[in-house]
Amino acid sequence: ESDRYTVLGDPTEACLGVVAQKAGIDTTNQINLTPRIRELPFDSRRKRMSTIHNLSTPIGGCERIAYIKGAPKEVLELCTSINKNGDKQELSDSQRNEIMEANDRYARNGLRVLAVAYRHLTKECNLPKSLSSYTPELIEKDMTFVGLVVMADPPRPEVKDAVELCHRA
């Protein structure tokens, strides 16, 4: 069995799918259990994207969940708690600093880093019934930090020529 994967579509999404599979998560089953019902697309100002999913089995009365991924600093600013071994705890300043220090270490080594977080969308959130009314301002707050995803993101082949051109300039 090869340890290489062939993927179609967005490379970041594909990488996250491979990571999930290597962690023992049945991604097909997960997609069926939590179908995506809305996406708040990535934009360069927010430096993140969010997806909203229905839960086939409500968790504590919660029927929907939002997931967010993006630049660690920006995602971390939206988090008020952290998931530690399945236990939701308040996110402390020292934990924030540790996370950003880890991010900086990875980035200095040329690795691409994404932060991942979630939020259970409960009735107390007072969200509108219409999914089209779900905005980043309503969804992307009070998040629970899950972790950092670190990827080797090699430069595109055309980068070598661009760098050489810059050196000759």
Q: Where is each model-derived feature located?
A:
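Cytosolic catalytic regions of ATP/NTP-dependent phosphoryl-transfer enzymes
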Residues: 1-145, 151, 157-169
